[in-house]
Amino acid sequence: MAYTLEQFCEDHHALLTSGQPLSKALPRIAERLSDLLNNPEFVAETFSDDTPVGRRTLAHDPDTDVYVLAHVYDGPKKGSPHNHGASWAVYGTAKAVTNMTEWRRTNPETEEQAVLEPVAHYALTPGLTRAYGPGVLHSTEHPGKAWVIRVTGTDVDAIPRFRFKPERDRIVEKV
């Protein structure tokens, strides 16, 4: 039987309430999200070519405050570097591709202007996932329309988090 959204929600709840460190739970949540994204019935029920651009909540666990969000991006679209503050996120692509970049801040956080350099680039193709712990800087790029599931540890729009501001911050390329 195919892995379902309900099973995924039960699994992430169990992982997050098991007492194990978040650093151990997040990769396992990412594995379970991959299982869900490899269920063609889930993908077909959640996304179609007519699904409007934007974000919608598929599930919210009030005990852990985890959100399972479905995103449709109308590419090409390139996001700026950001993190999820004290929370975390797991990204997974259902259809198309999400190009990810991970960043490192090269100057102290006490300085107002952030100086970032890229440390990793990779593609999340259908079924692939990646977990980003608290404070991990990353950015997304969608070369075309993309259908993505994002799981967050809370409502990340309601907490302080870093967002790259091009008028203030800068990016340096590695030599």
Label for each model-derived stretch:
Residues 46, 50-75:
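A short glycine-rich, His/Asp/Glu-containing loop-to-beta-strand
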